[in-house]
């Protein structure tokens, strides 16, 4: 079974998704992360069916069984985590200014690689502490 990486980002008021392999030209949007994950998988399957029907070459990773691996941008991570934790809590955990986190969430500014990792680690650390309560 092959793994297909799918990028998910936040655009204005929706999540948007597209496969990293641009030979499968599909996009999907959704108000929630779960909705966009489901929509992009359906869109890819529909597109692959069309490619097969028209005799087009199917990219290698889509031949046979495959499953998606979703890769969220920092903007998408921040928007999704807003449902569960406050930016103030994340700011305290990461030591990144709350306003700066807002700039990253809106796309006004793009964080560097080290900062992206710091944000992801901060979300994970808060999640672990919350899970420990139960």
Predicted regions and their residues:
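Short, charged, surface-exposed hinge/linker loops at domain edges
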Residues: 1-3, 42-99, 103-105, 109-116, ...
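Hydrophobic micro-packing sites on short alpha-helices
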Residues: 36, 116-120
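Short C-terminal boundary/hinge segments that cap the last helix of small helical domains
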Residues: 124-134
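Generic low-polarity alpha-helical segments
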Residues: 15-19, 119, 130-132
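Generic non-transmembrane alpha-helical segments
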Residues: 93-94, 122, 126
